[in-house]
Amino acid sequence: PAIILNNQISDRYYNKNACGTHITWDSIRALDDYYWTDYNESCLDLVALANISDNMNITSMSTRATINIGLSNINNTMFDTIIKSQEYSMKGIVTPHNVAFSVTPLINAFLRLATFEERVLLMNAFCGIDHEVFEYTKRGEVFPIEENIYEHMIRLFTSYRGKQNRMRDKALPILMKEAEQQY
């Protein structure tokens, strides 16, 4: 069986400014109420990340509150590691703006260029499946160092973000030239 929720066409779903993750979280909240459990609060930080990354309208009080509470209570180790890796560009302050312009671009670049296996690693990292150890040999070094999945993902994020930027910089003059020829 499947549960299908479409907040855009349902008369019973009040928040039209929520992303799919937020709607799923609302469903988890309802299940928590029904079964007397409390799983929903542990993933509120990821709901905030999804609402920000999907560029959702935060005029909805529910969406805004979810973002504010989620960013104030970061529980997910992968999300926390990404934030720490961007501490300099974020000036040590976690805001929706800083997440949108420092965290989201890293994740997006990675997802655009990563292999299927690397995407599975990212899912494992966000799910806290962190038993795997990776070996990495720095440029100019002889001996490899060991890194956990979170360190490994940050290195991949940074690498793919740089690669994406180089691809953009290489393509931009070509696109500009084509645009000038057309207009």
Q: Where are each of the predicted segments found?
A:
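Short alpha-helices
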Residues: 2-53
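Hydrophobic helix-and-loop "lid/oligomerization" segment in the mid-to-C-terminal part
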Residues: 32-183
